[in-house]
Amino acid sequence: MQGDAKVIDYLNKGLRHELTAINQYWLHYRLLNNWGLLEMAKVWRKESIEEMNHADRFTDRILFLDGFPNMQVLDPLRIGQNVKEIIECDLAAEHSARNLYQEAATYCHGAKDYVSRDLFEKLMKDEEHHIDFLETQLDLIGRVGLELYTQKHIGGLESES
């Protein structure tokens, strides 16, 4: 089915964001794991995989609309050098995605592509949950301090692979 060119462009922008997020969350997962914050690392690994599912949904929709998914371009990764920076970097990326998805959903509605609109709205809802989670983590750090916050996320002595 031939899709609206601007809708396909928005879908590719969403795909680019998700591909970037996969890598950013994965590297943060590996950093957290390396620092011994195994419980926290598990959450970041799960987020990376969730972003992969989002990318798959964009890819599927682009192909359905006879577009071509551009998987060769990523945005610059925002990599934190400590726990608080990791959360701040991921929060900035999630806000960026939410803003894009809101703009895209509005355009798709006007273009009468309700399936693409619904996809953007569904993923926007997921991003809002991520934003809420990350803001809560920053609030906790502010209230209990970084040392106590990270202490809660230390795992066992076994290495995670």
Language-model features, listed with the residues they occupy:
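Iron-associated oxidoreductase/ferritin-like identity signal
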Residues: 1-161
